[in-house]
Amino acid sequence: MLDTSVVVAGLIARRGAASALVEAFFADRLHLAYTPAILGEYAEVLARPELAGVIAPNDRIGIILKLRASGLLVSPADVPTAAWPDVDDLPFVSAALAVESKTIITLNPGDFAPAADFGVQVLSPSQGRREFL
């Protein structure tokens, strides 16, 4: 899973680990799983007015279309009860629990702190690039 923070950073920066992960996704070298909730969050965040001037419309639409076309749609797994810092991130935990790799790549690792207790690996973009690219 690429947390929304990584997608946004990758589309804005055009260099660095987040950008490399997004580029790898577009080039079919990184395969992502998603749920309808993740697709919705990507669409909602990328449509925010403050991102209109920094992320090209083609990129905003392209990542949604690419995810729908080549991503793995999974049924969300039940998320164990825990002291989750940001419940808005639970769709990513739910999807990670539903796939073999059980990995979330994020710029906000603290939001996923309890995930390790349930077998989910939380990586920074740099760690994700080293592990998956």
Model feature map: region roles:
Residues V6-V7, I38, G110-D111:
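Alpha-helix capping/helix-boundary segments
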Residues G10-L11, V45, V54, A115, ...:
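Residues that scaffold the ATP/ADP-binding catalytic core of kinase and kinase-like folds
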Residues M1-Y34:
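Short, well-structured N-terminal submotif of metal-dependent ribonuclease cores
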Residues A69-P109:
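Active-site neighborhoods of divalent-metal-dependent phosphate/nucleic-acid chemistry enzymes
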Residues G16, A33, I55-N58, A83-L90:
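Residues at secondary-structure transition points
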Residues L90, L97-I105, P109-L133:
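Acidic, PIN/NYN-like endoribonuclease modules and their adjacent C-terminal/linker elements
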Residues A24-V79:
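PIN-domain endoribonuclease scaffold, especially VapC-family toxins
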Residues S5-V6, G62, P91:
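Active-site phosphate/pyrophosphate-handling residues
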